[in-house]
Amino acid sequence: MSTSRKRSNKQRPGASVDPAPAAAAGSLWPPRRLIVSLCSLAAAALMVRAGLLEYVVGGIVDGAVRNIITLILCFSAVMSALLWFLRESGHALAWKQMLGYGLLGLVALGIATLRIERVSGDLVPEFRWAWQKSRDTLLARPVAAPPQAAAAWEPAPHDFPRFLGPTGDASLPSTAPALDPEWTKATPPREVWRRPIGAGWSGFATYGTHAVTLEQRGDEEIITCLALATGEPEWHVPVRGRHQTVLGGTGPRSTPSIADGIVYAAGATGWLHAVDGATGKVLWKKDVLADLGIDAAAHEVAVAWGRSGSPLLLDDVVVVPGGGPRSDGPVSLVAYDRATGERRWTVGDDQISYVSPALVSIGGRSFLVAVGESQAIGFDPVTRDEAWRFPWPSHSNSDASCSQPVVIGPDRLFISKGYGVGCAAFDIGPGADGAWTVKEAWRNKAGLKTKFTNVAFHEGHLYGLSDGILECLRASDGKRMWKGGRYDQGQLLRAGNLLVVQSEPGDVVLVEATPAGHREVARLAALSDQTWNSPAIAGDTLLVRNAVEAACYRLPLRGGATNAAAAPVENAPSVEPAADVSEPAPAPVVEPAAA
């Protein structure tokens, strides 16, 4: 072979190169580095789901944070694999284009056709079609019965007249009938009635043979009174307004308070009404935001999940949260005359949270307590002077405070919240100079992380849902006694030595209130949708509801005693054995009285 031919076979400078070999260099299989990355992301996601991340970063990781972190890890894994396939793999260009454009089309289709209706307590979304209306907008106003005679609105011995029961601490009085925990086929809870209801997280308050709650139907928040025996509407009072957010849901979230035949109700949008229980007539009404000079739009940003404080009846006034922003600073609480609706006084200087005003007894003295956005403050209920305060930081548009304070000793107040904060106990008493002092007794950042549930106290121990799992702490030092039973972001009441747990998915569960361990006694399939509402128990009558339906059950009592308010029915609901583990046309509306 000649020298000239050898030179002709060599690449000449500036000659073009066939791109085929470079394209062929891409592999059809992912490289080792991608496999290692995907395995690492999968392992991290499994650690997060197993709760192991809490041991690394502490109690700030709740169910919602776990879901967010898991979503980020899964998204990172999918995007890593997708980018490799589209940019580095040796697959045909047609396959790459098909996958890329197909995914873009699916994303665009989802954005165009789906909407997030709401999320669970752990931020799991529920979707609906973009053209589908919210369920509450499809409901007509409830049809009311003829007005009741005044004599029909008489109290009963075991009324549940306010949020969290007669004493407002999630514990029924010792005089309440004892529940029989043997929910067997022979003696199950019996369903008395069931009916659709509008949106909202309000609970029931009972007075004699009546049950009152709040609901959202379309653009109206409605005070609804039902016959306790039948569930039939007796009257309703609509109020124009609608609160709705993806994270907080739709509708009112406070529970009415009833005394002397008068219903006091507060809406999520800032109104307060006093209604005659016998007739449904509005006696007086107030726009609390306008009355206090609060900018409504700015208030909705600051208190993002809607006003949730239930009215507190204190002597001759009704006390509700105040709020802000306003020109001369926020107001913690505001009181209105129960008879006339005239504003009587305001106290405090903290932005409101989602905790209701409370009257507690500490050190032999009564205190009006406001748990706000940054402080817990105690006021003398007579003079309204501030007696004490201690910091309890939160933000009412993010890591909010929602749980009621609980007295756990002669001089000790317990307080808790979710979002990784946990709980603490404070000793409150008079100092040497007569001024009241506050000293932290103990703190448990990993215990009783009550996101928007409440705690019951019984025989020296505290019981509550901590990040969705039932937990028992010793009140003297905050030590965890046990933790077990996932009921998600539900609610609970204590009836004697039993905990009545309303799980977020809808089941009602009986659990023994004992520090010995988690002992589930019985389970009732009461509701079948997301439930953040607190249950109510009046004698042997259990009232439950969520944003879709309400139901009434007759519970078996020890000794076979019954409550005449709710008549029995023939059909019994489905009761599961304990786990062996630790509308028609709108009704006429009564014209409200002038504000």
Would you name each region that the model predicts?
Residues 26-576, 580-583, 593-595:
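Noncatalytic, solvent-exposed loop/strand surfaces
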Residues 1-22, 580-584, 588-593:
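Short, intrinsically disordered terminal tails adjacent to the first/last structured region
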